[in-house]
Amino acid sequence: DYEIKKLSEQFYKDYPHDQYQEILTKEGRSYDVVLFEIDYLADCYVCVPFRTEMKHNNGYKFKFSGRSKKHQSGLDFSKLVIVSKNEYIGESSTIDIDEYKEFEKQEDHIHKNLEKYIHDYVEHVNGHMSLHIKQFERKYKYSTLKYFHKELGIVVKR
């Protein structure tokens, strides 16, 4: 199951832009996100933001909405956040109706690709699966996943 929400002001206070530069911020307002639950991330939500312009393929690009005809709109996996506190979840949000309908139809596909995006990162960083350096950079160089190693169960050996 999923919900469409905004992230709360408390989230942005606890994850300030100067320390978490890859997390999306919009002056004075929050991003709309889809809350996904993923089996191996118990007690957490994976919040994937809707973007008007997504110039890469690390996510799901809408194909059938009016907005997607003018923009590269999509759900951006590279800017996801993982939250374990309910206080980080803000109010419900409404999104473009065409994108909502397309999301509903594609939800299983999006969910599977999101799980793979996270899984491949964790496996690479933990040393269980090695992605080519160029492939890793293309997928994860600007990713927010580096901020959520604790939630992902990643222990970086020093």
What are these regions (language model features)?
Residues 66-158:
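C-terminal terminal-subdomain/extension
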